[in-house]
């Protein structure tokens, strides 16, 4: 009996020791942030050889990046047989899917590539369901734009920009022109793609409210400006009631109100682009993903030369559009945290890892090592043929002297969304 008891006690001690040695996902991330890519890749091979990492993301290109990552690991260790399975949920269901996996007894997903900073902040970061990992070689990389891209870690910034059809005589020289009387910009509904709603939240932040005020001041005096002035005046008590702190918040609310009342809701940016580049879309305008221009098929009726990017025009005043981000995060219940960290490092610190996204205009890595030059995408045989496709790059688009994009900040969106979201919904609902 004593021998049996001793054996049981010994086994219990061994199990306790094993559990003590088991690393939490948080502990893995803390260690991983001090390691080079080479060290991370070795850990990934050790952890996931013969296993499958399940990733989930808003971008289907994660599958391409995953295949490249596995190929790279196999070059390091030809005996490595790990795989990556990537899925892309539909209809904004990614948050539901992730939370269900985290709460389940059988955890499947290890990491995610996710958009919508507001929901990420409130549903995932504030709750601790998603964990941020910052690769050492990213944080210490030369020229990496760390601020604004580290909390949470951004794989890329994408832009949606104001464009207009140039077949007619109408021009748009000021961002307020897109909410002028009778103008109806083509735009995805704010509740069908929530990054668009985040754009509206961000307009009330001081920097962007100031952009709108400066653009308003640049408008010529007359009936059109008087119409806007009346709406701004109407918004002064609203700004106070909503607790907005920016001095020029009434200008932001006026812009939001008019934009929501007037935009022509579309199901997707692809159809918006396909409409605007036709000869028949005279004087129409829209706010859409810049990279859609890459897919335009030239014909007698359709051409990239039938549209203009508003911010590229000389003398343009105000915001040129908005920027949202794809964020890389590790689930707190990740079955393969080391491999997740290594995969994230691969995508954010190597040109091969970012290639699935970097091959197109309109998507920007914070790491210059990953970026490809798209400044001459509109050139054909050395001739500037489609000027609108010549991407001026992240720094130009986000600068006060350039495109003045409204850049998503998850913390700010989360701060104002509760009340401001309802306010926007009332406007949209009354259209």
Question: Where do the model's predicted regions map?
Answer:
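Short, low-complexity disordered leader/linker segments with a strong preference
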Residues: 1-49, 431
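Conserved C-terminal helix/tail region of periplasmic/extracytoplasmic solute-binding proteins
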Residues: 23-33, 38, 391-431
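Short, polar/charged alpha-helical segment
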Residues: 34-49, 59-81, 162, 296
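Extracellular/periplasmic catalytic domains that process cell-envelope and extracellular macromolecules
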Residues: 46-47, 104-108, 146-147, 153-157, ...
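Loop/turn elements at helix/coil->beta-strand transitions in domains of secreted/extracellular proteins
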Residues: 49-53, 79-82, 107-111, 182-186, ...
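Extracytoplasmic ligand-binding site segments that recognize negatively charged/polar headgroups
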Residues: 51-71, 84-97, 107-271
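Extracytoplasmic/periplasmic substrate-binding proteins
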Residues: 247-251, 261-333
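Mature extracytoplasmic/periplasmic domains
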Residues: 322-407
């Amino acid at each position: 009996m004593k021998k049996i008891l001793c054996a049981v006690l010994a086994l219990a001690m061994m199990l306790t020791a094993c559990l003590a040695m088991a690393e939490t996902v948080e502990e893995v991330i803390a260690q991983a942030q001090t390691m080079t890519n080479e060290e991370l890749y070795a850990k990934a091979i050790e952890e996931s050889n013969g296993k499958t990492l399940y990733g989930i993301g808003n971008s289907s290109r994660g599958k391409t990046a995953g295949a490249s990552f596995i190929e790279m690991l196999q070059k390091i260790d030809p005996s490595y047989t790990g795989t990556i399975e990537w899925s892309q949920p539909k209809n904004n269901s990614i948050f539901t899917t992730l939370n269900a996996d985290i709460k389940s007894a059988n955890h499947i997903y290890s990491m995610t590539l996710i958009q919508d900073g507001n929901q990420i902040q409130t549903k995932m970061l504030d709750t601790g369901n998603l964990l941020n990992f910052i690769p050492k070689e990213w944080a210490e990389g030369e020229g990496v734009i760390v601020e604004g891209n580290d909390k949470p870690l951004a794989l890329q910034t994408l832009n949606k920009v104001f464009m207009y059809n140039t077949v007619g005589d109408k021009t748009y020289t000021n961002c307020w022109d897109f909410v002028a009387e009778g103008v109806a910009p083509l735009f995805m509904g704010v509740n069908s793609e929530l990054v668009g709603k985040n754009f509206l939240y961000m307009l009330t932040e001081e920097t962007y409210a100031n952009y709108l005020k400066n653009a308003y001041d640049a408008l010529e005096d007359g009936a059109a400006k008087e119409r806007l002035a009346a709406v701004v005046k109407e918004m002064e008590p609203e700004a106070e009631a909503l607790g907005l702190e920016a001095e020029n918040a009434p200008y932001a609310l006026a812009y939001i109100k008019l934009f929501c009342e007037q935009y022509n809701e579309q199901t997707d940016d692809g159809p918006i682009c396909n409409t605007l580049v036709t000869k028949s879309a005279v004087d129409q305008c829209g706010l859409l993903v810049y990279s859609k221009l890459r897919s335009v098929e030239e014909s007698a009726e359709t051409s990239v030369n039938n549209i203009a990017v508003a911010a590229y025009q000389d003398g343009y005043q105000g915001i040129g559009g908005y920027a949202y981000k794809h964020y890389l995060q590790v689930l707190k219940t990740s079955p393969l945290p080391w491999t997740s960290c290594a995969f994230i490092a691969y995508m954010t610190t190597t040109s091969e890892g970012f290639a699935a996204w970097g091959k197109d205009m309109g998507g920007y890595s914070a790491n210059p090592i990953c970026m490809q030059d798209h400044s001459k995408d509109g050139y054909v045989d050395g001739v500037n043929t489609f000027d609108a496709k010549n991407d001026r790059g992240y720094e130009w688009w986000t600068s006060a002297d350039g495109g003045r994009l409204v850049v998503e900040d998850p913390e700010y969106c989360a701060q104002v969304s509760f009340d401001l979201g309802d306010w926007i919904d009332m406007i949209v609902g009354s259209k």
